Amino acid sequence: MSPSPRQRSTSHRKPLPTVTWRQGVHLVGSALWCDALRAHGLCFVSSVRAIPRARKRAGTLLTTQTTLSLLSALHRAPEGAQLLSPLRRPFFWGSLRLELFANSDLPGSASLWVKLPSEERVIVAGQPSEQSSELLEPLQLRQAETLVIAAPWAPLHQELPTLDEMAHSVRSERALAQAMGVPLLVRCSSVVKLAELVGTLDLGPLKLHVDLHRAWQWCQSLPRFPKLHSVSARTVAPGEVLWWPHAAPPPKLPVTPRELHLADGLSRAGLVRYARASGVRQVYLTAGFSSEVAAALSAHKISAAPLGPPQQLALFGELAAP
């Protein structure tokens, strides 16, 4: 006997997604959120990037001690309960098996590996970086079926510029700014990238956005971190360099500066390498989705889709799959 139309439609129904967006990444059927914008039951925070401004509560905060300390230095640490975990130390939270592991992005930053009661495994990666630094733990990998990740520079770069190439860009742009009689605004969100660059540049005292300045001061106690003087600044003289995070509103300068954006995280090829090495079949991008990124993953039979608030999804365009 052939199945009824109702039976046929049920048998071909797509499985429900493992993750969804609910003011942050939410693991469906659980009380676990990741890098969420509001307070929830248990909220994993991958790095200081995930809490861009101060807020009162974030539910029970799951993160590393280093990230919490850096959040406090930036005046962004939420109030409430905390569940601090070292890296590479699996534990159970209810029916979920969890593990934090290094993503080589910022001091204290981590990715989260989750094993669901269904045995399905999910990685919430944050914004990992494969550009190694002696200031951070090397990038680590775990195996999973689903990956949630931010790779904002993947649509623009097949491979990210090297540190030497970035330093050359800063020197060249500064020379042009000096010739034009304007400041140079360097957009850089990573205090680690900044530390590696200034070691190769002769810029004098660092003039930094207040958040970069606070992070820089906090990092002075870390081993091997460069001991260079920095000041919090909102303006600089023509020909000088002002370092500014990507997400911060531009400073109000007397003249329009030259502007240079420094990439970090994963390139398009780096994202493909990360996904393949993790064995995933589905990738959700909280930043960095594009048709080119989806096609690069699709070539390896990995589906890709954007994950974020509705206004963000409109920018991403249509989801793509192999």
Annotate each predicted stretch with a short phrase.
Residues 2-13, 203, 218, 222-322:
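C-terminal regulatory/interaction regions
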Residues 10-38, 42, 48-185, 192:
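His/Asp/Glu-rich metal-coordinating catalytic cores
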Residues 35-37, 84-87, 101-103, 209-213, ...:
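Conserved beta-strand termini and adjacent loop/short-helix elements that scaffold enzyme active sites
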Residues 36-37, 48, 64-66, 125-127, ...:
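Structural motif
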Residues 53, 68-73, 156, 194-196, ...:
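Short, charged/polar "capping" segments at the starts of alpha-helices
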Residues 62-65, 80-85, 204-213, 301-310:
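Short hydrophobic/aromatic-enriched beta-strand-loop microsegments
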Residues 139-142, 165, 200-205, 299-302:
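Short, solvent-exposed amphipathic alpha-helical segments in soluble enzyme
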Residues 165-238:
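Hard-cation-handling environments
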